[in-house]
Amino acid sequence: EISTVNCDECHQVPTNYLDNGHLDSDNIAEVIFGSVATDSSVLSPTWDRSNTSCSNIYCHGAFSFSYGDSLITGNNSSVIWTDYESAECGTCHGLPPDGHTGTWTKQQCFICHSTVLDANGIIIDKTKHINGQVDLN
């Protein structure tokens, strides 16, 4: 697990089982993207139930931000939920992310992002990964 994304980022959390927007007549949970997934309504993500994938979504690299003179961009991957390789490091953003200055390895990310991951490139605080913010030291 690489993040602690809440259910309400992709699903309406009901008060009751049969509430509108939870399970309709097809008995399949509805996908309704939340503020992190849509980057505060900047994006219009899509869900394709036939191939179990979502696209144009912040969580999988549909983002860009400026840091200093650099424009950092994600990969904007279309992730297939049944394919575990879709969530490996480097699928949502490059290692380092496109536009990042310098040459870095995954093990060096902690130099600026030590509240998120350790010197081995392992995420240590999942609440700070895929949270809609750039977490710098």
Question: Locations of the language-model features?
Answer:
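Flexible linker/context regions in extracytoplasmic redox proteins
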Residues: E1-N137
